[in-house]
């Protein structure tokens, strides 16, 4: 009996995988998942994990993985189709009979899948020393060539002859998406003189091919024509290899090209898939979210990559929530993922992953970076664009968080660029002052002094991101901040080694100024050993926010007649002043005690 793909999906949704697994082994709840001793290898410590929400099992020991049907297949020795039938019978689920059209569809599908497997065997036999050398120069190893079944389609009639010898009608190759027809009616091999890369579905069946030209012909890459088994809007290259790793790491990395996937997989990043040169679709996103809660986009940094990012952002915003996330790796200029890992190594790419930015941060980068906002109109347009993004979010809590995030970014990055600094006499909360620095510059120095005196604070991502994203008036100080965060904080340099490292740089004078025991830029009470760092951070953050408010307050008074908005600024300023006064009293009490 043949079972449809739709019925497979019905079983996955209908039957809790933990109920089936529990019949074979004891499971213990751990957070939202279950754990137990793996039935597929000997172990003493449970490494077998089951997730009902993701409808998936994974063993951290032997790497066995799959859905409820795959588990039944592995346990019973039955085929995938037979296991689906067994589960349906065990749970009293009626198996729908195939209609005549469905039978014809699956017969045709089987024929196409068989032709594609034969085509792949042929392509694999055509790898010449020249082709292998090309692949080796791209740092693709012999093991990887075999693992991904990379082949070659020669520029001759061997391909057609191969199938004719097997008594397979040439028109069947067209149904499989392997050949095309010229305007004059002549049939041609779609992948002639191209490296071939088989595209497999989630069940590890070849459903199409990608082809990469050897020379400079265009198009450089192409895919099989779409068929009844191959739709680019649904398939992701590498998905059959990525799913178990994505489940294990609770994330997927989405790139643009075949060789990006191959290079990253070879470097140990097995959770990588590619979108086959097409726009990312809702189907792609939902498929990846079923395996892991986070999708990390790693697209080229050129204009095409930025446009692809914007399309994906607009597609994803109605779908994301506090659990289902999108983030972005920002590649250095001129690098694609393949180049990044081959030229700089796996550790370099791992650091790029660690420094990935959130969806909200990517939106801000796209709308703000490299642009000027000198006029009220330009600023209003920025606010409108950001609001439009927020309005696409369906999750109300997340939408509110995005509004707050963009509001904070506008304060930090736009208001601080105004030349005029307004300090109303009502502001009785003062930071340590100097004849050489404005109050804002004093705060910039104070933030940098935190790097040196309290580096533990920067383990908090929110604090690190806030400091890193500030646009300093003092550009030398900004360069010091970037260097110190990346080279000292991120690399966890030991305290007794820092001075020797900084001494060899152009930042040594700044370092000495900021690291003095009687630091001018931090209040005397902040230098106590028992200072509560959370209060210290609140004080500095609120002080910085207050200065921004004061500047925006002044701009609002001078540039428009929106009195309601002016009153809101004034009310917020008074509120922050009072909060700072309370914090000041806390520090005074600490100093006295």
Curated annotation (Swiss-Prot):
Q: Where are the zinc fingers (CHC2-type)?
A: 38-62
Q: Which UniProt keywords apply?
A: DNA replication, DNA-binding, DNA-directed RNA polymerase, Magnesium, Metal-binding, Nucleotidyltransferase, Primosome, Transcription, Transferase, Zinc, Zinc-finger
- Keyword Mitochondrion included in the entry's annotation: no
Positions binding Mg(2+) 2 in this chain are 300, 302
What InterPro entries does this protein map onto?
DNA_primase_core_N_sf, DNA_primase_DnaG, DNA_primase_Znf_CHC2, DnaG_bac, DNAG_N, DnaG_primase, TOPRIM_DnaG_bac, TOPRIM_dom
Q: PROSITE patterns of this UniProt entry?
A: TOPRIM
Q: What is its EC number?
A: 2.7.7.101
| One Gene Ontology biological process | DNA replication, synthesis of primer
Q: Where does Mg(2+) 1 bind?
A: 256, 300
Q: How is the cofactor bound?
A: Binds 1 zinc ion per monomer.
One GO MF annotation is: zinc ion binding
What CDD domains does the database record attribute to this sequence? TOPRIM_DnaG_primases (cd03364)
Cofactor(s) this protein requires: Zn(2+); Mg(2+)
A GO CC term assigned to this protein in UniProt: primosome complex
- Mind telling me which NCBIfam families this protein's record contains? dnaG
The family this protein is said to belong to: Belongs to the DnaG primase family.
| Comment, domains | Contains an N-terminal zinc-binding domain, a central core domain that contains the primase activity, and a C-terminal DnaB-binding domain.
Stored PANTHER family: DNA PRIMASE
Q: What is this protein called?
A: DNA primase
- Gene name of this polypeptide: dnaG
């Amino acid at each position: 009996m043949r079972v449809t793909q739709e019925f497979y999906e019905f079983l996955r949704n209908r039957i809790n995988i933990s109920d089936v697994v529990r019949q074979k082994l004891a499971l213990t709840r751990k957070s939202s998942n279950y754990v137990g001793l793996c039935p597929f290898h000997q172990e003493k410590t449970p490494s077998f994990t089951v997730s009902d929400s993701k409808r998936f099992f994974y063993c951290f020991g032997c790497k066995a993985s799959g859905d409820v049907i795959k588990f039944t297949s592995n346990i019973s020795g039955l085929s995938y189709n037979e296991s689906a039938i067994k589960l349906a019978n065990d749970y009293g689920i009626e198996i729908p009979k195939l209609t005549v059209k469905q039978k014809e569809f699956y017969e045709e599908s089987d024929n196409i899948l068989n032709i594609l497997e034969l085509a792949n065997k042929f392509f694999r036999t055509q790898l010449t020393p020249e082709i292998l050398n090309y692949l080796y120069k791209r740092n693709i190893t012999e093991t990887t060539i075999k693992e991904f079944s990379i082949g070659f389609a020669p520029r001759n009639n061997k391909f057609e002859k191969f199938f004719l010898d097997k008594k397979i009608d040439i028109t069947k190759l067209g149904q499989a998406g392997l050949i095309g027809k010229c305007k004059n009616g002549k049939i041609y091999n779609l992948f002639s003189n191209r490296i071939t890369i088989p595209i497999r579905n989630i069940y590890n069946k070849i459903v199409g091919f990608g082809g990469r030209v050897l020379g400079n012909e265009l198009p450089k890459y192409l895919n099989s024509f779409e068929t009844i088994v191959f739709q680019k809007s649904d398939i992701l290259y590498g998905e059959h290899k990525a799913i178990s790793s994505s489940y294990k790491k609770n994330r997927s990395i989405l790139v643009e090209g075949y060789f990006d996937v191959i290079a990253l997989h070879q470097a140990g990043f097995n959770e990588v898939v590619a979108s086959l040169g097409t726009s990312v679709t809702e189907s792609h996103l939902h498929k990846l979210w079923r395996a892991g809660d986070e999708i990390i986009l790693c697209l080229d940094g050129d204009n095409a990559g930025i446009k692809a990012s914007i399309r994906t952002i607009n597609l994803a915003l109605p779908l994301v929530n506090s659990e289902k996330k999108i983030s972005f790796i920002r590649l250095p200029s001129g690098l694609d993922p393949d180049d990044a890992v081959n030229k700089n190594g796996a550790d370099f790419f791992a650091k790029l992953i660690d420094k990935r930015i959130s969806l909200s941060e990517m939106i801000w980068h796209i709308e703000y970076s490299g642009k000027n906002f000198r006029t009220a109109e330009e600023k209003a347009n920025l606010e409108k664009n950001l609001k439009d993004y927020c309005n696409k979010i369906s999750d109300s809590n997340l939408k509110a968080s995005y509004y707050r995030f963009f509001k904070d970014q506008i304060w930090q990055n736009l208001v601080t660029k105004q030349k005029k600094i307004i300090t109303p006499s009502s502001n009785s909360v003062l930071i340590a002052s100097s004849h050489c620095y404005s109050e804002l510059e004093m705060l910039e120095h104070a933030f940098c002094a935190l790097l040196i005196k309290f580096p533990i604070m920067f383990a908090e991502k929110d604090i690190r991101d806030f400091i890193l994203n500030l646009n300093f008036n003092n550009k030398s100080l900004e360069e010091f901040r970037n260097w110190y965060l990346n080279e000292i904080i991120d690399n966890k340099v030991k305290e007794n080694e820092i001075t020797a490292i900084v001494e060899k740089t152009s930042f040594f004078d700044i370092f000495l100024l900021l690291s003095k025991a009687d630091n001018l830029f931090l209040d005397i009470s902040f230098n106590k050993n028992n200072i509560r760092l959370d209060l210290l951070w609140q004080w500095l953050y609120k002080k910085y926010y207050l200065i921004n408010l004061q500047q925006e307050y002044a701009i609002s008074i001078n540039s428009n007649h929106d009195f309601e908005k002016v009153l809101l600024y004034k009310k917020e300023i008074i509120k922050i002043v009072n909060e700072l006064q309370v914090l000041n009293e806390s520090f005074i009490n600490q100093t006295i005690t």
